[in-house]
Amino acid sequence: MPMTSPSSAPDDIRPSATDTAQPVRRRGDPVAPRADRDIGAPSLPGGRGPTTSQKPPRVPGRTGELPPAHTALICVALPGLAISEEEGQLNGRGLEGVYRAGRRLLSRCRLSVAGREPLPVQARMVAADAARFVGTLRVAPDAGPDPDMVVERTRHADGTERITLRSSSLRTLRLPVEIALGTDLAELGSIASGRPGPELTASVHAAGLRWSSATGHAAVTADPPPTDALASAGLLRWEIELPPGGAWSVELRVRLDGAGPIRTVGRGAASPFAPARAVSDRLGAEALLRTSVEDLQALLLRDPRHPTDIHLAAGAPWRCGLAPADALVAARMTLPLGTRLAVGTLRTLARTQLTGPGPRAGLIPGPLRDAGPHLPPSCTATEGTLLFPVLLAEARRWGLPEPEVEELLPAAERCLEWLRTTVGDGTYLSDAQPNGPLRCETQAHAHRAALLGADLLDAYGRTGGLGMRQWAQEMRTAFPDDFWADD
């Protein structure tokens, strides 16, 4: 089978427009504390701040107001998420928290040492699934102007966090360390729509705390175990001793009750992407490729009913689910790294295809972006339906085995039949909405689907390829006159 390079393919197909999301801070970007924001900076001389042994008041906000995400550090290893602000403390505001499968397992995780909260110095992404926070403290009574302790926190999307205290003091420090925890076990959809749940009451559980609600249970365990655990305040407490230059660490693990650790799809031998390296005069090309593949691996999900089929999710952090057009475009762009993602995406979407009589037969349903009862679902199926035969045809060119192509060919034929039926005797494919506009990008998708779909039909002895090419040529001829606008 001839191999074609993506660079030689016409670029008349563009990824579909996704929801407007706030930009996410990229890994490696240092963050300085902001003076216009309460980030736990010391409020008393000597760096003294509020202790976390008292539950902080809920931050007031307008009901239904969408929480901001433009400054958040978002760690992704689906189905796990960890969303943090720059200071590293989880305060229960907005989207902050640790999530699994769309449920917030931990919304509050505030560290204090000897009653003081660390002063934020740096926050950055270190991988797609991890963020690192650095802060400083002045804890010794006779400390000078320089901090005598550095606090490092590394938070992962799988629900683990490691906190390390490093002393630069010249004498031994004996200090209480407190971590205040809390959660509402709310669904991400409710939180994203500005309606989080009330904070739940904790109970002491093993080496940590546990929360329960009608929808589930979550627990946090600590290693080493705390000296004291106070359920009423949601507080874990240690009494530590640090010699000069010494360090102390604790690891927190957040889990759904009864669930094991998150097993991500794209790690190690399970990755659908073949090893690749970038050869370029640009020094950053290799790092860019590596980072891009890692980001894609973090967004991989399995079809729950067919675990061998994988696809890419879209919509982080607001929702992390299957958006057909986005998944098909992304799978097409990764064809140089293998066809496993493409075939998994196609199989998953083929199982959702609408069948039976009616004008919608053959459609690949769009993303049902259901955020619970608060935000209505939206469904845009046209682009996904047009992209399905395109991806199948191009995956075949990139070496998808013939038996797998033949398995998916009936679904591609139904997509093309929907296109023929919807266009009818006309020249263009109209918008899915009644009396909707004729979008130029939709015509680009339809033109490519007709041409590559015709190649598929011809290759497997199906009829209809000639008619698809004739219609594509008619549309191409008429398009400049109908869509071109002169200044």
Q: Where in the sequence are the language-model features?
A:
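Aromatic-rich carbohydrate-recognition surfaces in CAZymes
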Residues: C320-G426, C440-Q443, H447
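Catalytic cores of carbohydrate-active enzymes
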Residues: G426-A432, G436-R439, H445-D487
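Amphipathic alpha-helical scaffolding segments
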Residues: A127, A180-T183, D257, R347-T352, ...
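Terminal accessory carbohydrate-recognition/targeting modules of carbohydrate-active enzymes
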Residues: M1-V293, D309-I310, A316-D326, R332-R340, ...
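Glycine- and aromatic-rich loop/turn segments at beta-sheet edges
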Residues: L300-P317, T355-H374, R420-N435, D481-D487
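The core hydrophobic/aromatic register in alpha-helical repeat solenoids, strongest
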Residues: L209, L392-A395, A450-G453, L457
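An acidic intrinsically disordered interaction segment
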Residues: L283-R302, L346-P359, P480
